[in-house]
UniProtKB/Swiss-Prot annotation:
Residues in PID domain copies: 41-195
UniProt gene name: Ldlrap1
InterPro entries listed in its UniProt record: Adapter_Engulfment-Domain, PH-like_dom_sf, PTB/PI_dom
Motif, [DE]-X(1,2)-F-X-X-[FL]-X-X-X-R motif: chain positions: 256-265
Organismal lineage: Eukaryota, Metazoa, Chordata, Craniata, Vertebrata
Sections of the chain in a coiled coil: none
Protein name stated in the entry: Low density lipoprotein receptor adapter protein 1
Protein keywords: Acetylation, Atherosclerosis, Cholesterol metabolism, Cytoplasm, Endocytosis, Hyperlipidemia, Lipid metabolism, Phosphoprotein, Steroid metabolism, Sterol metabolism
PANTHER family named in the record: LOW DENSITY LIPOPROTEIN RECEPTOR ADAPTER PROTEIN 1, PHOSPHOTYROSINE INTERACTION DOMAIN-CONTAINING FAMILY MEMBER
GO cellular component, as recorded: basal plasma membrane; cytoplasm; cytoplasmic side of plasma membrane; cytosol; early endosome; neurofilament; recycling endosome
Record carries keyword Phosphoprotein: yes
């Protein structure tokens, strides 16, 4: 386990990773520029959003696919006439943790290995959406969230993509270590730097919550959060996890799910997003202090969904 943890930390500290993904070399702006701090990503970037809803999709990625899904979700949210649920979205290399902003209760915990696509919608420019494979029945779900402004939607998208890249590289290291151990077992020898019988597999690491040494999910008692919007396809919105739920289960099949989703991506190592090169450059230059600045439009954000 120590070897895998060290590998994970090394990947996070990798200068090449920082330069490729986060436009490194801007350390003079720390800590204001969140894109240059690995600690921020490891601890989890937190965004305050409003949950629009969810719909099922047929494919794991695609700009047109996600745009059509978001259009359906927004139409359903508008038709319901209900206030949107305020949620907190925490993004880290472990995945997305969704909690109710008013009650602090856990709504859903999505493994980063099940996310296949994320985007800042082009038509509804304040909407962030992601597509993930359901743990229950392996169906593909598109979840959409209303942000206060376009640049927040872009920032969330870029953060999820970066978290995915870190997790993917960690997964690769884990897979290589596992293959070395299996080869050593077959040959009856030991692999230097590994312990054949005691080093856990990727699934065990994820199940015990040790991935990249991130903090454990709060274990406070949870109760059901009422739904504030109706969902497309009559699919129930994410429910609060019960006391006995294991967020990262041993038999979750994350390794297999991640391998399958990797085949659908343009580049297996990079999460497909709907961001253009200009969007990415703009989002990389953002500071969290910019997010609180009001838009020049002056539109009331509470009713913003009805202005689409």
């Amino acid at each position: 386990m120590d070897a895998l943890k060290s590998a994970g930390r090394a990947l996070i500290r990798s200068p090449s990773l920082a330069k490729q993904s986060w436009a490194g070399g801007r350390h003079r702006k720390l800590p204001e520029n969140w894109t240059d701090t690995r600690e921020t990503l490891l601890e989890g970037m937190v965004f305050s959003l409003k949950y629009l809803g969810m719909t099922l999709v047929e494919r794991p990625k695609g700009e047109e696919l996600s745009a059509a899904a978001v259009k359906r979700i927004v139409a359903t949210a508008k038709a319901s006439g209900k206030k949107l649920q305020k949620v907190t979205l925490k993004v880290s290399p472990r995945g997305i943790i969704l909690t109710d902003s008013l009650t602090s209760q856990l709504i859903e915990n999505v493994s980063i290995y099940r996310i296949s696509y994320c985007t800042a919608d082009k038509m509804h420019d304040k909407v962030f959406a992601y597509i993930a494979q359901s743990q229950q029945n392996e169906s593909l779900e598109c979840h959409a969230f209303l942000c206060t402004k376009r640049k927040v939607a872009q920032a969330v998208t870029l953060t999820v993509a970066q978290a995915f890249k870190v997790a993917f590289e960690f997964w690769q290291v884990s897979k290589e270590e596992k293959e070395k151990r299996e080869k050593a077992n077959q040959e009856g020898g030991d692999v230097p730097g590994t312990r054949r019988d005691s080093t856990p597999s990727l699934k065990t690491l994820v199940a015990t919550g040790n991935l990249l040494d991130l903090e454990e999910v709060a274990k406070a008692p949870l109760s059901t959060v009422s739904a504030n919007t109706n969902n497309v396809d009559e699919t129930p919105r994410p429910q609060v996890l019960g006391n006995n739920s294991v967020v990262w289960e041993l038999d979750d099949g994350l390794d297999e799910a991640f391998s399958r989703l990797a085949q659908s991506r343009t580049n297996p190592q990079v999460l497909d997003t709907g961001l253009s090169a200009q969007d990415i450059h703009y989002a990389q230059c953002l500071s969290p202090t910019d997010w609180d600045k009001p838009d020049s439009s002056g539109i009331d954000q509470d009713d913003d969904v009805f202005t689409f």
